[in-house]
Regions:
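Eukaryotic intrinsically disordered, low-complexity tracts enriched in Ser/Pro/Thr/Gly and charged residues
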Residues: 1-6, 113-115
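Short amphipathic alpha-helical heptad-repeat segments
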Residues: 3-18, 56-70
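Generic L/I/V-rich hydrophobic alpha-helical segments across diverse proteins
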Residues: 13, 17-20, 31, 35-38, ...
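Amphipathic alpha-helical interaction modules
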Residues: 24-68
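Amphipathic alpha-helical binding modules
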Residues: 71-115
Length: 115
């Protein structure tokens, strides 16, 4: 068994996920990817990109697999899932305290127009 990931407080992650809901529902792929990542960290289940099933607490290897899958989409062949992967990657990095910029204030969805 691998160690769980050190994350922000679950209440903070949940609040950010709730704040992302309107933008995600309006069709922002970046915000949908971010919200899916945060919900996955809170409840487990299939990984948003890999589909790998995980329970709680989410093991580090599962987060690394999702980040790797996101990187493959972002830097791989042009894809309609690029913005989604960028949102997922940003949210996981934020939840892991690797960046201070929350997904709701990130500019990823505005800058990504390449497909």
């Amino acid at each position: 068994m691998t160690a769980p990931v050190a994350l922000r407080d679950p209440a903070v992650i949940s609040a950010e996920s709730d704040t992302l809901r309107p933008a995600a529902k309006s069709g922002s792929a970046f915000h949908q990817g971010a919200r899916d990542a945060l919900r996955w960290l809170l409840v487990g289940g299939p990984g948003p990109l890999t589909g790998g099933i995980t329970g709680l607490p989410i093991p580090l290897r599962a987060v690394v697999a999702e980040l790797s899958a996101a990187e493959a989409v972002i830097y791989g062949r042009p894809s309609g899932r690029r913005d989604y992967a960028m949102g997922l990657e940003h949210a996981l990095m934020w939840a892991e305290l690797a960046t201070e910029t929350a997904p709701t204030t990130a500019r990823g969805s505005e800058r990504s127009t390449r497909q």
